[in-house]
Amino acid sequence: MSHWQQITGGVTAAKGYRAAGITAGLKASGAPDLALIVSDVPAIAAGVFTTNHMCAAPVRYCRQRLQTKGTAQAILCNSGQANAATGEQGWQAVLAQADMVATALGFSPEMVLVASTGVIGQPIPLEKMRQALPTLTANLSDGGGEAAARAIMTTDLVPKQIALEAEWEGQTIRIGGMAKGSGMIHPKMATMLAFITCDAAVSPHLWQEMLQRACDRSFNQITVDGDTSTNDSVIALANGQSRTPAIAEPGAAATRLEEMLTAVCVHLAKAIARDGEGATCLIEVQVSGASDDTAARQVARTIASSMLVKSAIYGRDPNWGRIAAAAGRAGVPFDASNLAIALGGIPMMRHGQPLPFDPAAAHAYLVQQAAASTDASGQQSIDHPVVIEVSIGSGSGRGVAWGCDLSYDYVKINAEYTT
């Protein structure tokens, strides 16, 4: 049973954080496009970033910054321009962004992290950003989490945010997060971005290790289209403002905090997968029986990323053969005679042999889950995924991955992205 409860507020739920999101004119659509998160005090900062060799200038900047100085006090994020494949001009733009935020807030540029998302190859409109900065900083508030979450959206249909609260040594610890992502989602960190705020006090090396493991179980286990972005970034701040005892070494307290951090990351990851471009439902692939968890996660992610599996789910077609084929090409050796597959609890294969099942019932399950993926108010839901269960043997390894179905709208959205 979890030891926390979900609360409102997103990145500003944790103590000592303010945020803002505004329209700076960076997008032709006039949608919000500039977000800022600020900690009242310097915070321990950890980051996990894309492995794409064409990584964007802000990714290179943040990676370098966190290697030399593991603290930060502000995160600036624009949407509309990725600042990737922009050469020296892009690098200088990142430095200018950090400098203008630092000047406005009164601290060193080294305390500012920068992120971007949008069209690759387009330069950052620095002058528009500079003109908008006074409005952005004036809008900073401890209720600005949702505005910030909306300002980092691109093809996203909904903002993605969460906050958790737990009682801790007679005090309260909170972790908040926001993310964006809808297309070009196949992170290897680690386009997707996630920003996490925490008011616990934790040592830098422990915080980085916690974030890496949390990402391995969440953001690195989602896929929409198999493309790894140039800008994938997860940045987590911990400012110690909860006044709880500092967590300096592994132990019970560190385990509890990591579980809470992982829960935030999993929620945001599932929200990204559900909001995949053109998607109508969330897919959850559960794999068991592997030699270890890493192998299980690899099989799960391969199945979740299969275009044939995704297409079948969109067509509400219980085609288990595509699931079996995807499992077999995951690069994880297993005995085919041990393979078992179930869809929505309906067994379809056991001991490597097909089982008789009612196709109409399986089809009805897929229809039901797709309908439940959008609630009565029209909001997306991550609580009713299409569940695919796969067992590949008798090992103790388990893993989960999330994806979405593949619809005609995915092609339409991406065919018209810059036109």
Curated annotation (Swiss-Prot):
Substrate binds at T154, K180, T191, E277, N414, T419. It catalyses: N(2)-acetyl-L-ornithine + L-glutamate = N-acetyl-L-glutamate + L-ornithine; L-glutamate + acetyl-CoA = N-acetyl-L-glutamate + CoA + H(+). GO terms for biological process: L-arginine biosynthetic process; ornithine biosynthetic process. Pathway: Amino-acid biosynthesis; L-arginine biosynthesis; L-ornithine and N-acetyl-L-glutamate from L-glutamate and N(2)-acetyl-L-ornithine (cyclic): step 1/1; Amino-acid biosynthesis; L-arginine biosynthesis; N(2)-acetyl-L-ornithine from L-glutamate: step 1/4. It is an enzyme of class 2 (transferase). One of its GO terms (molecular function) is L-glutamate N-acetyltransferase activity. The record marks A190, T191 as: Cleavage. Its EC number is 2.3.1.35, 2.3.1.1. One of its GO terms (cellular component) is cytoplasm. It holds the Pfam family ArgJ. It comes from the Bacteria. It is found in: Cytoplasm. The record marks T117, G118 as: Involved in the stabilization of negative charge on the oxyanion by the formation of the oxyanion hole. InterPro entries: Arg_biosynth_ArgJ, ArgJ-like_dom_sf, ArgJ_beta_C. Keywords: Acyltransferase, Amino-acid biosynthesis, Arginine biosynthesis, Autocatalytic cleavage, Cytoplasm, Multifunctional enzyme, Transferase. Catalyzes two activities which are involved in the cyclic version of arginine biosynthesis: the synthesis of N-acetylglutamate from glutamate and acetyl-CoA as the acetyl donor, and of ornithine by transacetylation between N(2)-acetylornithine and glutamate. Belongs to the ArgJ family. Heterotetramer of two alpha and two beta chains. This is Arginine biosynthesis bifunctional protein ArgJ. The lineage of its organism: Bacteria, Bacillati, Cyanobacteriota, Cyanophyceae, Acaryochloridales.
